[in-house]
């Protein structure tokens, strides 16, 4: 999982990527290709 300052590029990397907010942090999850997972500080 990458820690990024901006998730704009992360959510457009793959069409299955979704932006989700958990525990006050913002995550990008991708079920079909999990190496695109990312989180924002």
UniProtKB/Swiss-Prot annotation:
The gene behind this protein is rpmJ
UniProt record similarity statement? Belongs to the bacterial ribosomal protein bL36 family.
Protein name per Swiss-Prot or TrEMBL: Large ribosomal subunit protein bL36
Which organism is this protein's natural source?
Xylella fastidiosa (strain M12)
Q: Which GO terms describe its cellular component?
A: ribonucleoprotein complex; ribosome
Q: Which of UniProt's keywords are assigned here?
A: Ribonucleoprotein, Ribosomal protein
What the entry lists under PROSITE patterns is as follows: RIBOSOMAL_L36
| Domain of life (superkingdom) | Bacteria
What is one process in the GO biological process aspect for this record?
A: translation
| GO terms, molecular function | structural constituent of ribosome
Which Pfam families did the record assign? Answer: Ribosomal_L36
Q: Does the keyword Transmembrane apply?
A: no
């Amino acid at each position: 999982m990458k820690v990024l300052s901006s998730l704009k590029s992360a959510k457009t990397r793959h069409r299955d990527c979704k932006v989700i907010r958990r525990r006050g942090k913002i995550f990008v999850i991708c079920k079909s290709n999990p190496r695109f997972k990312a989180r924002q500080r």
